[in-house]
Each structure stands twice: as structure tokens, then as C-alpha cells.
Amino acid sequence: SVQDYRQAMGELFAPMSKVAAKNPYSSAPVERTVDELVTVTDKNRMICDPYPRLMVARDQVNMGAAAVLMSVESARKLGVPESKWVYLRGHADMKEQKLLGRPDVGASPASVLAVREALRVAGIGIDDISAFDLYSCFPFPVFNICDGVGLDADDPRGLTLTGGLPYFGGPGNNY
């Protein structure tokens, strides 16, 4: 039912709000309970059924973000400290099939295939990952990835390091 799905979304995102509440850079550092997230009120109005306001991203600041990829040689030449280096081990790029052309309109196969391909390129499996930051403006993509790669929503590693897009923020929120 819609209510069961809304409850599942609240259970998925409440732990993310808890992480964001402890993050000094969070745009919305408030821990929210499942009930706060799923209950429609004047302050948590329905944005688009089944998503109340507190379960979707809300831009609060306007800015941009970027990542610069370079070789080790270039990083050394530019004086980038090794403590700031991040090695790209796996990657993938997929194009999603048009919504009405999918066998299941409630799934996003390309995102799951992209995760699987990135893991394959990296030569690792989902169990080799020690930390996740599944980032989306609303719950469906997080569920989609979890379901598609066999990751439990209550995995002890957690699903976010930052607090997730609705609570920590994104490029539009100084991320």
C-alpha cells in the first residue's frame, strides 16, 4: 500500500537524517523520526504523492561543485598533498531506457547495471565496500540500488557518510 511504502521510506531516510544531524556541514542538521518524515503536516506538506517535503531534497543555498581527475604525476607536479588523493578504482556510465519502454516502470535498471559494472571494473563485490554514500533527492533510487545489488536498507555499514541529499545537502546546498 502507499502507506506501507511511505513507512518504508521513512525507515530508510530517518537514519540518514541522524547522520546529517551530526555533520557540521549539513544544510539540515536535524534528526528526524520516522513519524516526522512520513506524517503530512503544514510543515511537511505533500510535494508529490507519496513524497512529503521532508523526504525530498530542498535546495537552500546556490553554488556548484566539481571533481578534478588527474594522474599521480600531475598531482605531484601541482603539489596536491597525498592525503587528499582519491583513487578511482571503478566506474561506469549507463543510459536509462525511456520510462515507458522499461519492462518495469518501477525500476531503474541502468543505475543498478552501473553499480555492478563499477564494482566489476574495480574487481570487488558489494561485500568489499566498507562505507556507502547513496545520494538521491528522494527515496526511490536508494531503494532501487539496495534492491538491485542485494544491500539491506538497514545494513550495519550504513547507507550514507554525509546524511544524504535531503538532509546533508548537495551542490545547491554547499556540498
Model regions and ranges:
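C-terminal catalytic subdomain
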Residues: G169, N173-Y175
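Conserved "HGTGT" condensation-loop signature of ketosynthase/thiolase-family condensing enzymes
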Residues: S1-A67, V72-S74, V80-G169
